[in-house]
């Protein structure tokens, strides 16, 4: 019908592709994503989100239709920004709480898709805890992390990082590190090792390669240094050092979700 009405061939193809789970052309993908995100945002805002087994408007299918093509085409796409922009075009108000619900719903479908691809539950959840708003990036992170957890030396890599996280995660304050307060050799060595690999990693491989380099210094630090020192400033300085290491995983993966953490 589109061709008969005088539309260009690529436009006609895109119109047909918007109903496919994974459109093959860029125009078809753009149309499909816009349609599916608009449906999700509008219906959630209207209070018509799926409940239990009931999904009369096919929103679970729509969410899968958002994440699957982005993964298969490996397209960098910010779902949070897309939902925010779509919310502004709706005839009814879409507040921040509803937008969060939409993103959590899509994340749930993304989790299903990744597990159906054969990835382990804990690996998927570790990644989605930090970067569920970008399906293609999430899929690549899950792929990378899946390789790491199968390594022979994983049993020494994960515990080293876990020690840093466990002792700092309940701290309500982020402490700065004052090099002048570093007194023990092992804490100085750990600080120097961290400085040598300074810079926030951008993916799983970069992050865990840093942890590998830090692991010997981390283990020596915990073996020789009393983190909870009586001197408040020294204690907070040491906690700050470990917080810096723990924060390396921010935006990449929450390793506390992994088996054996």
Predicted segment positions?
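Amphipathic alpha-helical "coupling" segments that flank catalytic cores
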Residues: 1-261
């Amino acid at each position: 019908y589109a061709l008969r009405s005088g539309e260009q061939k690529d436009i006609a193809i895109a119109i047909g592709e918007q109903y496919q789970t994974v459109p093959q052309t860029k125009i078809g993908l753009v149309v499909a994503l816009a349609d599916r995100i608009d449906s999700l945002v509008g219906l959630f805002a209207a209070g018509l989100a799926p409940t239990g087994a009931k999904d009369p408007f096919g929103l679970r299918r729509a969410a899968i239709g958002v994440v699957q093509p982005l993964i298969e085409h490996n397209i960098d796409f910010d779902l949070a920004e897309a939902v925010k922009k779509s919310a502004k075009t709706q005839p009814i108000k879409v507040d921040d709480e509803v937008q969060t619900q939409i993103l959590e719903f899509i994340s749930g479908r993304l989790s299903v898709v990744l597990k159906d691809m054969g990835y382990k539950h804990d690996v998927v959840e570790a990644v989605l805890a930090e970067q569920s708003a970008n399906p293609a990036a999430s899929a690549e992170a899950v792929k990378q992390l899946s390789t790491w957890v199968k390594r022979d030396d994983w049993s020494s890599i994960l515990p080293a990082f876990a020690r840093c996280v466990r002792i700092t995660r309940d701290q309500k304050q982020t402490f700065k590190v004052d090099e002048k307060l570093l007194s023990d050799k092992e804490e100085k060595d750990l600080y120097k090792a961290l400085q040598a690999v300074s810079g926030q990693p951008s993916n799983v491989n970069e992050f865990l390669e840093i942890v590998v380099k830090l692991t010997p210094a981390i283990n020596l630090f915990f073996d020789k240094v009393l983190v909870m020192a009586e001197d408040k400033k020294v204690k907070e300085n040491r906690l700050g050092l470990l917080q810096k290491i723990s924060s390396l995983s921010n935006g990449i993966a929450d390793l506390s979700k992994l088996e054996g953490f």
